Amino acid sequence: MTLNLAEYDVLVFDIEGTVCPISFVKDVLFPYALEALPKVLDQEWDSPEFAKYRDAFPEEYRNSRPDFEAHVRDLVKRDVKIAYLKSLQGYLWLQGYKSGDIVAPLFPDVDPFFNQAVKDGKKIIIYSSGSVPAQKLLFSHTNSEKSDMTPLIADYFDTTNAGPKTEVDSYRKIISSHPEHKDLGRWLFLSDNIHEVSAAVEAGIRSVPVIRDGNAPLPPDNSLTKLAISEFKHSEDA
């Protein structure tokens, strides 16, 4: 299945498993943050800059460096998507992106599709469980020709400013943030997670699941699975 850009005004993209491999997050970003954590805690535990991340954690962890570190490692191990962890991870990734140690490996169809969409006057929005600052870091340090993809992106949403990605109200918040686009039939949300796709559809917008190498299989008995795409490709015949 291909996409006809003429049918849409707003394109909302998930990140992990949609525009870049799940393995990048699981095998590169998460381990990098854990590796950087002890040094940051040693050097910055009492610094004003780090305090805003530390103090966002529950009280029982923010007063003890060992307890703090143990809690972070436990959350990552259990893949808990909670705002205060995501904010800390974004902070830990910052130096990795700046040094060039981290480069986001976007799928090869993402760069041309984003550019074509913007050229055609479409609005691109990112919605991920990763914090908005972490999203901006990722898209400003990619393997695409110009590296920085942020000029193509109109807005960013995460679990803090929108809400959990499997909840219908989260998509309604995103929609309400762009009242200039009242025709919900001209919105499209793309994600590898069928539960997120279902929530978006329930909110009134169009949505299709994305199949990428390394993703978990989509449930065969779900009607939305039949709509799945495996690449971002524009076709006027779609």
From Swiss-Prot:
Its main location: cytoplasm. One of its GO terms (molecular function) is acireductone synthase activity. One of its GO terms (cellular component) is nucleus. Pathway: Amino-acid biosynthesis; L-methionine biosynthesis via salvage pathway; L-methionine from S-methyl-5-thio-alpha-D-ribose 1-phosphate: step 3/6; Amino-acid biosynthesis; L-methionine biosynthesis via salvage pathway; L-methionine from S-methyl-5-thio-alpha-D-ribose 1-phosphate: step 4/6. InterPro entries: Enolase-ppase_E1, ENOPH1_eukaryotes, HAD-like_sf, HAD_sf. Its EC number is 3.1.3.77. Coiled coil: none annotated. Binds 1 Mg(2+) ion per subunit. CDD domains: HAD_EP (cd01629). It holds the Pfam family Hydrolase. Substrate binds at residues 128-129, 165. Its cofactor is Mg(2+). Belongs to the HAD-like hydrolase superfamily. MasA/MtnC family. Monomer. This is Enolase-phosphatase E1. It comes from Fusarium vanettenii (strain ATCC MYA-4622 / CBS 123669 / FGSC 9596 / NRRL 45880 / 77-13-4). The lineage of its organism: Eukaryota, Fungi, Dikarya, Ascomycota, Pezizomycotina. The gene is UTR4.
